[in-house]
């Protein structure tokens, strides 16, 4: 049995944010052969579920690793089987850092986004992530449980996010990590989680040898799982800094079924 962990945006999904029919056919063939699929994303769980259902991949044999590996959901049993959260004291501290720096910070429940305002950043974000928005200046007082992550968003100024990242790592590196998933998005989550930690935990849970694991991605928040997997796959359209860590670089982009070709050659071949 082999297991494929794949990022969504710019990896599994094409430029229309869809799983192409061809890629879906290849994935279903992979599942029919007894292999496993993990949709591994920085997105919140509700959004990953939406992608899986739209692609008709909300089926046994598929797992959803959301919030950068902080939450793993098993479709077959309808259960969250693994989770790492951010303590509320740290939610408050990061939120207030963002406010002081004039940076949009948001956080999540499994079904909603908590945003400080209905601003340009949340309007941009919800074009792709279709979850309801709760406007809140103090989400740590309103959330029913600790969140899996926070997200800092700056639409036009990555440098501001770099400064925030350095501040978070200087002050809270005992508990938090902060990694870019794009030039606009800084992911902030429990330092003991991450896509790579989620990969290692699930392989152990399913008794699958790491050498039989594959991880595909395109951005820096995919690095930990690309390194952790027995076979790291980087999309040819991915950031150049990832290429040295890849055992496999796709010949085609996410918009040309690049991942499907790798599945056919390396998992089904």
Where would I find each of the regions flagged by the language model?
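Residue-level signal for inorganic ion chemistry
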Residues: 30, 41, 68, 150, ...
């Amino acid at each position: 049995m082999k297991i494929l962990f794949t990022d969504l945006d710019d990896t599994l999904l094409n430029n229309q944010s869809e799983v192409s029919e061809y890629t879906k056919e290849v994935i279903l063939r992979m599942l029919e052969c007894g292999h496993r699929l993990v949709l591994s994303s920085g997105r919140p769980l509700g959004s990953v579920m939406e992608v899986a259902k739209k692609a008709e991949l909300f089926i046994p044999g598929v797992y959803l690793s959301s919030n950068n590996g902080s939450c793993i959901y098993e479709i077959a049993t309808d259960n969250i089987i693994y989770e790492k959260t951010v303590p509320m004291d740290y939610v408050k501290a990061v939120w207030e850092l963002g406010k002081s720096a004039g940076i949009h910070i948001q956080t999540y429940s499994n079904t909603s986004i908590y945003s400080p305002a209905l601003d340009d950043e949340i309007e941009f974000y919800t074009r792709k992530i279709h979850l309801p928005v709760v406007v809140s200046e103090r989400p740590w007082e309103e959330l029913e449980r600790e969140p899996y992550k926070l997200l800092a968003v700056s639409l036009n100024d990555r440098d501001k996010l770099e400064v925030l990242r350095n501040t978070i790592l200087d002050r809270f590196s005992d508990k938090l990590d902060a990694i870019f998933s794009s030039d606009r998005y800084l992911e902030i989550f429990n330092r003991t989680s991450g896509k790579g930690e989620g990969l290692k935990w699930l392989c152990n849970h399913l008794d699958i040898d790491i050498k039989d694991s594959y991880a595909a991605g395109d951005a820096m928040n995919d690095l930990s799982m690309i390194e952790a997997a027995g076979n790291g796959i980087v999309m040819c359209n991915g950031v150049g800094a990832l290429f040295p860590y890849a055992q496999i670089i796709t010949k085609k982009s996410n918009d040309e079924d690049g991942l499907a070709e790798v599945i056919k050659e390396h998992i089904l071949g």
